[in-house]
């Protein structure tokens, strides 16, 4: 039954039924409406307090747990619940994989409405913690206070924080002591930066007043052991910048690439900023199957290096190359997949919209002594056309790995026009992948599907699909 609590409703003894989109779970209210709520596990029985009432559903939170799900485990992170990162850290990993697989299947079936083969088993990640090679943190002088801190009555003179944005709160940062997503020295570097900044009165960013020296921190690591650290400063305070950068260079001599940016825009994106090298080189090296890839501050690289290797192996297997094929790699990025499959292809043509990525792709190919890869820059819908195919030859296999929005309809139409026998579609968003597969269904059938978990403790999942001409 429901009872009023101020202007909100409390539903008692509600069973959590399923895991839904964006990492929230799903239940049903007594009035039949769906309830979406975070930090619970399917199988839990809870009292739910509604936070928002919509026309067809409620948004709520669990205020009391009566029964624990058999799939529930204790989160390892002290920040779980407040931090919006690892939303499934309280769920057994085997069950996380179940729901990720279910999400892919439901999207392909409900959105794509296409005939599907039996899914191949979702590939789980050997590492479920400390698997990320890139983390970004924010500085703020408006630290988010947790419920426990507020209830303690403790006065906090220092409100500086270095950590993650609270979901839906652009001006609040949750101070992070230990993050379980990136291996050390990531935590040590972050905590030492915070300590040094506080001790030396270096100001943390104030998002409302738009002032302060320290703005963001990025740490990238590689399987080679190399480390990149980049700090975004908001104010052009030469003394403060040199003080922090000299400290980092001396305190962490193992940093391979130490860089900074002075960013006085309203947003903190790096891609239109001039990056200043303070010490070392402006890139780190990642290694995969004997190939080396340079990663600079602006490079896109899969954030789970070990699982990226598994993803690329599946992609290469689906392509079924014999050494005689011309392969097109659409949305090639820095050319990682293109070079990874090049050993088993006659020629690989990579296309990418970001000029800096193509510069990296060409440099990586030269570094790896790969001579059968060519890379071209341009907007995919404008570059991938009849003229391009006439110039570079009819492809035997096309690999496409678009961003979350999927492929532009003009690209899909061109794919159909190429009449290529085989397409391997790698996706980080099975919903847009399903939409694109539906557009190709008349000419191509899905013959293999394999989801890959790149992001344990989250709801995100990659998916690889092999299409063959009907």
Where are these regions (language model features)?
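Short, aliphatic-rich beta-strand segments
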Residues: 219, 225-234, 292-296
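Short, acidic/hydrophobic/Gly-rich beta-strand patch recurrent on exposed beta strands
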Residues: 25-30, 163-166, 361
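Extended interfacial segments that mediate partner engagement and assembly in macromolecular machines
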Residues: 64-74, 81-203
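Short, conserved phosphate/pyrophosphate- and ester-handling motifs at nucleotide-, phospho-/glycolipid
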Residues: 43, 182, 304
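Internal alpha/beta scaffold segment
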Residues: 171-207, 211-213, 221, 235-259
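Rossmann-like S-adenosyl-L-methionine
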Residues: 2-13, 21, 25, 236-470
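Terminal RNA-binding accessory module
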Residues: 1-79, 374
């Amino acid at each position: 039954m429901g009872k009023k609590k101020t202007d909100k409703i409390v539903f008692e003894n509600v069973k959590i039924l399923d895991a839904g989109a964006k990492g929230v779970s799903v239940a049903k209210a007594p009035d039949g409406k769906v309830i979406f709520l975070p930090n619970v596990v399917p199988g839990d029985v809870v009292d739910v307090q509604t936070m928002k009432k919509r026309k067809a559903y409620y948004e709520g939170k669990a205020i009391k747990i009566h029964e624990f799900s058999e799939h529930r485990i204790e989160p390892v992170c002290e920040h779980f619940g407040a931090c919006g990162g690892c939303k499934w850290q309280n769920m057994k990993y085997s069950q996380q994989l179940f729901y990720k697989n279910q999400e892919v299947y439901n999207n392909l079936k409900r959105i794509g409405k296409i005939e599907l083969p039996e899914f191949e088993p979702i590939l789980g990640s050997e590492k479920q913690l400390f698997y990320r090679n890139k983390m970004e943190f924010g500085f703020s002088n408006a630290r988010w206070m947790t419920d426990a801190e507020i209830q303690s009555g403790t006065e906090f003179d220092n409100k500086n924080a270095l950590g993650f944005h609270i979901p839906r709160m652009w001006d609040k940062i949750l101070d992070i002591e230990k993050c379980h997503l990136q291996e050390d020295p990531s935590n040590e570097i972050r905590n030492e930066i915070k300590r040094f900044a506080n001790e030396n009165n270096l100001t943390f960013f104030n998002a409302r007043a738009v002032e302060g020296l320290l703005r963001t921190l990025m740490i990238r690591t590689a399987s080679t052991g190399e480390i990149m650290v980049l700090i975004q400063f908001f104010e052009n305070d030469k003394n403060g910048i040199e003080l922090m950068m000299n400290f980092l260079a001396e305190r962490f001599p193992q940093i391979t690439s130490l860089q900074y940016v002075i960013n006085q825009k309203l947003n903190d994106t790096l891609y239109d900023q001039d990056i200043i090298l303070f010490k070392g080189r402006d890139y780190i090296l990642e290694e995969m199957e004997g190939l080396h890839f340079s990663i600079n501050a602006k490079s896109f690289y899969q954030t789970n290096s070990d699982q990226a290797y598994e993803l690329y192996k599946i992609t290469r297997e689906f392509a079924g190359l014999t050494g005689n094929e011309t392969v097109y790699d659409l949305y090639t990025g820095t050319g990682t997949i293109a070079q990874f499959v090049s050993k088993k292809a006659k020629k690989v043509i990579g296309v990418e919209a970001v000029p800096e990525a193509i510069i990296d792709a060409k440099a990586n190919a030269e570094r790896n002594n790969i001579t059968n890869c060519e890379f071209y820059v341009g907007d995919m819908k404008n570059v991938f056309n009849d003229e391009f195919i006439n110039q570079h030859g009819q492809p035997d296999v096309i690999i496409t790995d678009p961003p979350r929005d999927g492929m532009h309809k003009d690209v899909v139409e061109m794919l159909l026009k190429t009449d290529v026998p085989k397409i391997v579609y790698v996706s980080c968003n099975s919903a847009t992948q399903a939409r694109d597969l539906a557009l190709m269904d008349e000419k191509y059938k899905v013959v293999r599907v394999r989801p890959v978990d790149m992001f344990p403790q989250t709801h995100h999942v990659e998916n690889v699909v092999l299409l063959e001409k009907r």
